[in-house]
Amino acid sequence: MSGLYSPGFSPARNLSPQIRSNPTDVDSQYLAELLAEHQKLGPFMQVLPICSKLLSQEIMRVSSIVHNHGFGDFDRHRFRSPSPMSSPNPRSNRSGNGFSPWNGLHQERLGFPQGTSMDWQGAPPSPSSHVVKKILRLDVPVDSYPNFNFVGRILGPRGNSLKRVEASTGCRVFIRGKGSIKDPGKEDKLRGKPGYEHLSDPLHILIEAEFPASIIDARLRHAQEVIEELLKPVDESQDFYKRQQLRELAMLNSTLREDSPHPGSVSPFSNGGMKRAKTGQ
């Protein structure tokens, strides 16, 4: 996204009448910045739900402006407050872990519930400005490669590799199915309980994207390509990605030993260590 993000651009900057700037281009640039912010916020959406909601609403608003041509519409949208769109909690209608074992895409309309399809000045939003949610399932080839540590490769030290994937794609990634919980004994106890139905399925990855309808498929495809690349087994002698993870783990362990008042009391596999934060939810 670095090619789209322009640090010098300010959405609050007024256009001078003497400057022949294309307002659609200006707002397109602002939309690109909003999407870049959405990417950066990805790993923190759970702890900053209000920020995520407000950012999604602004993305919807600006997407609508970009698709309206002409200075009249642009000025009417530009110098007003964001429309007070209500956005339902995307997780309010989930039961258990919120996912059922299926292949393909699940789509959910957000932000424009029935009865609020017009903004506060009466302008209908562009259909492509709707923020939608899609979930894609990718099966992990554990049957073909039973000895390959797919989960560790995706998670990385303390889940950092997974966090970077989420930050770079703007999508959330969940590891589900048999083998998604580190402790096999705990997994056996949880299997079949409400919220853990997925443990009866083969190991799989869920990619969740939440973007305007006009771009969500492209973003989801990008995330799919990144995950599929990680799911390709590599010979250990040629696995540069794993070597990078091991170096990162060594650095984290060294930092922990220096910071801990009781050397050896902190392990990267303890609660503060190699967590499988995206499993068993």
Swiss-Prot record:
The keyword Magnesium does not apply. InterPro entries: BBP-like, KH_1_KHDC4/BBP-like, KH_dom, KH_dom_type_1_sf, STAR_dimer. The gene is SPIN1. PANTHER family: QUAKING RELATED 54B, ISOFORM E (PTHR11208:SF42), RNA-BINDING PROTEIN RELATED (PTHR11208). The keyword DNA-binding applies. Residues 81-95 have a biased composition (Low complexity). Interacts (via N-terminus) with SPL11. Keywords: DNA-binding, Flowering, Nucleus, RNA-binding, Ubl conjugation. It is found in: Nucleus. Ubiquitinated by SPL11. Ubiquitination probably leads to its subsequent degradation, thus negatively regulating flowering time control. This is KH domain-containing protein SPIN1. SMART domains: KH. Induction: Circadian-regulated, with a peak in expression in the middle of the day under long day conditions, and from the middle of the day until night under short day conditions. GO terms for biological process: flower development; negative regulation of long-day photoperiodism, flowering; negative regulation of short-day photoperiodism, flowering; regulation of mRNA splicing, via spliceosome. It comes from Oryza sativa subsp. japonica. One of its GO terms (cellular component) is nucleus. Residues 139-205 form the KH domain. Residues 13-22 have a biased composition (Polar residues). GO terms for molecular function: DNA binding; mRNA binding; RNA binding. Residues 1-22, 77-126, 255-281 are annotated as: Disordered. Expressed in roots, stems, leaves and panicles. Involved in flowering time control. Binds DNA and RNA in vitro.
